[in-house]
């Protein structure tokens, strides 16, 4: 089974068309299809033929209600704060989705405090094997370094991953680090960006 995870399209329809042409069993949009909610319907028309193969998270540019309505209109799966099973070659896996970002200086519509992030992750403690898709990166990795020595990730997410060691973490949000990977213990971490990351399970 092939899973294509991508993020931060921000209304770039050409990039989204490239994603839609790729072959996958599941397509996970890890937030920020739009710019402040504008252009979601244009994205929906491109992805509509894929139907329930498309799982969607809100980024910090979208609200949960916008993404829920968007998924209802186009027949997609609202993946925000959901746990969904997928069968891999080696057995069952669990996929968890968490949208929004940690707090930013920009007061965007979809932001969580560290306390809210902790509350959202608590229900995932101990689930194995877990594949975690979030919009925002963990702190102090190659994925959240937006300028040399400057990091914008979530300390709460970092601590949770260190403690729980999911098999994979996929994120976006920091455009400057799209395509980079890192490890936290045994957890493989990827900033998927708008070009996406294809995982075979």
Where are these regions (language model features)?
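Conserved catalytic scaffold of divalent metal-dependent phosphoesterases
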Residues: 11, 62-156
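Active-site environment of divalent metal-dependent phosphoester hydrolases
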Residues: 10-15, 34-38, 60-67, 102-106, ...
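Binuclear metal-dependent phosphoesterase catalytic core
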Residues: 15, 69, 83-91, 108, ...
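Divalent metal-coordination and catalytic microenvironments
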Residues: 8, 27, 32, 59, ...
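Core catalytic region of metal-dependent phosphoesterases/phosphodiesterases
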Residues: 6-88, 192-196
């Amino acid at each position: 089974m092939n899973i294509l995870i991508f993020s931060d399209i921000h209304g770039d329809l050409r990039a989204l068309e490239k994603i839609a042409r790729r072959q996958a069993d599941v397509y996970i949009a890890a937030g920020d299809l739009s710019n402040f909610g504008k252009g979601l319907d244009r994205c929906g028309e491109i992805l509509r033929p894929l139907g329930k193969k498309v799982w969607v998270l809100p980024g910090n540019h979208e609200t949960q209600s916008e993404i829920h309505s968007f998924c209802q209109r186009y027949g997609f799966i609202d993946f925000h704060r959901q746990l969904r099973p997928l069968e891999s070659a080696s057995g069952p896996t669990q996929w968890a989705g968490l949208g929004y970002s940690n707090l930013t200086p920009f007061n965007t519509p979809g932001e969580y405090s560290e306390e809210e992030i902790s509350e959202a992750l608590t229900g995932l403690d101990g689930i194995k094997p877990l594949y975690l898709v979030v919009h925002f990166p963990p702190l102090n990795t190659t994925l959240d370094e937006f300028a040399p020595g400057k990091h914008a990730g979530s300390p709460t997410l970092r601590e949770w991953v260190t403690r729980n060691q999911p098999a994979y973490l996929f994120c976006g949000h920091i455009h400057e680090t799209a395509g980079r990977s890192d490890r936290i213990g045994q957890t493989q971490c990827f900033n998927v960006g708008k070009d996406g990351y294809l995982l075979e399970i």
